[in-house]
Amino acid sequence: MNLVSVKMLRSDDIDPARDSKHGATEFYIVYRHLLSLGKVFDTPLAAGPIRDVALTAGFDWNSKDNRFAPRKRVLVLGPTLRFKIAPPGFLDVSLLMAKEWNHCGLPPCKAPGNEDYIGFDAYPMLHAAWRVPFALGGVPVRFEGFFAHAFRRGEDYTGRPVGEEFLMRTALMADVGAAAGSTPNRFFMGVGYELWRNKFGNQDMPGVDTNTPTLHARWHF
């Protein structure tokens, strides 16, 4: 199974683009491939609440045009437990090893003895993704999202310890097409929430913690 997520995030003037009064723009791409070990070995691996065991591999790619100018590149690999939830729902919990490279465009990162582009120490990351379907007033609804907890990964561009990073995004999505009597599982709308702590491992500085309500619209091809 493959997952590809491409997001574009536009900030307001509180987080401006470099040398600009307008908000910065960020692109974030995630790719994950789940290889079912049950299918590879042709042996059912279900046990209790677990329906399968998989191997997850993938990458993250990020770019943002603010003063910090992050260019995050991450490779991940590790096992995933896939839990039993009625389709189209799922719950996958992974323990991944990750290797990250990133960039810092701030002046202190370019000072003698510091680095503006580094490879962090390899680190473990706990990751979970879910989709729980149910009906609300006769309308098909999905509670979906993910969280990722990245543990410490060495020092940053100026030699300071990198903090543990936590990111969670959730959304409550309604099947608008089905509610309108059209094709189900095609068009969804909903509301969500993002909680991010120590963004990119930075800590004890402005702008690294976010609490963001979100609006979502999604079309399934």
Protein language model annotation of sequence segments:
Residues 162-163, 170-221:
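Predominantly the C-terminal beta-signal and adjacent terminal strand-loop region
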Residues 21-29, 69-77, 118-126, 139, ...:
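Residues that define the transmembrane beta-barrel architecture of outer-membrane proteins
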Residues 1-65, 78, 169:
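Transmembrane beta-barrel domains of Gram-negative outer membranes and organellar outer membranes
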Residues 96-162:
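Short helix-loop boundary/capping segments
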Residues 1-3, 35-55, 82-93, 133-143, ...:
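Short loop/turn motifs that connect adjacent beta-strands in outer-membrane beta-barrel proteins
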Residues 3-14, 59-65, 97-105, 132, ...:
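Transmembrane beta-strands of outer-membrane beta-barrel pores
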Residues 14-20, 66-71, 104-117, 154-161, ...:
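Outer-membrane beta-barrel translocator domains and adjoining extracellular loop/strand segments
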Residues 30-36, 78-82, 127-133, 171-173, ...:
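Outer-membrane beta-barrel architecture
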